[in-house]
Amino acid sequence: MIPMDVVLIVLILVLVGYFSKIFGILKEEHAKILNNIVIYIAMPSTIFLTISKNVSSSQILEFLKLPVVIFLCCLFVGILAYLLGKHIFKLKDEKLGGLILVSMLGNTGFLGYPVALGMFGEEGLARAIFCDLGGVFATMLLGTYVGIRFGKGRDKSILKDMAKFPPLITGILSIILVFFGFKLNYIPSFILKSLNYLSSATVPLIMMSLGLSLSPKALKFGVFWGIIASIFRFIVSPATAFTLSELINIKGLEKNVLLVESSMPSAMMTLVLGTLYELDIKLIASSIFITTTFSLLVIALWGWILLN
């Protein structure tokens, strides 16, 4: 797909959600309902079908490099954000924890899937799903650690909930099935068609949910930390991914998808973590809005570099 087309499709679908909120068709709290439909129904269908169609057992070990690199990128960026916030900006714990989260965790699923699908087709989406597994584990382990270490809700944990996260479970089970030679033609056609219908809802619902969740009002909390987070998300993270891909010999489409996925804006999940652990919500909200807005330019740039 033409790079600019990818950006315009993403923008239009996000704006559908945003203007649905502006005109009172939907409310911001409806984003949670859409998210539940995506997480529990549509996205698992997409993950199962995409991995089953586009991944062979001989590719699995090569593809498993992708979540490892994404996880290491999150870890490295998190350490740098900690050093910057702690020793340069002298931030208090709540603000420091928020900065680490928005710098470290990228939106590899809710934005990464549509972008990878638009740029690289279903084969690219299959690789993006593997990348997102690394993002999920980073959220479970690193994100929870940051919340406990720098937040106030120290007795709370999302580890159990994340361990039951349907896309994660579906991804792991799909990989296991493919490894043992499972084929989609083993499934009755009416079930496959049903899964395809459910899967087709994933991208538009994700984008509409994103549009409902975005709020320009967050800019009143300041843009500085959003710019800092953008530097980490759009420069440091992909530079780290590129370096690691060279070291462990990731090439071709895997490398291209990895670079795009490592450049995703701050994850919406950071707001959940920030609320749960009582971190600086204003910093997190403004950073999500700013990095998501900038990401449209970054997506267009990656498309121009990788597809031309």
UniProtKB/Swiss-Prot annotation:
Cellular component, GO, one term? plasma membrane
Mind telling me which residue stretches traverse the membrane in this protein?
6-26, 31-51, 63-83, 100-120, 128-148, 162-182, 195-215, 221-241, 257-277, 287-307
Q: Decide whether keyword Cell membrane is in the record.
A: yes
A Pfam cross-reference name: Mem_trans
Q: Which GO terms describe its biological process?
A: transmembrane transport
Q: Which PANTHER family match?
A: AUXIN EFFLUX CARRIER FAMILY PROTEIN, TRANSPORTER AUXIN EFFLUX CARRIER EC FAMILY
Protein name from the UniProt record: Uncharacterized transporter MJ1031
Q: Which organism is it from?
A: Methanocaldococcus jannaschii (strain ATCC 43067 / DSM 2661 / JAL-1 / JCM 10045 / NBRC 100440) (Methanococcus jannaschii)
* Lineage of the organism: Archaea, Methanobacteriati, Methanobacteriota, Methanomada group, Methanococci
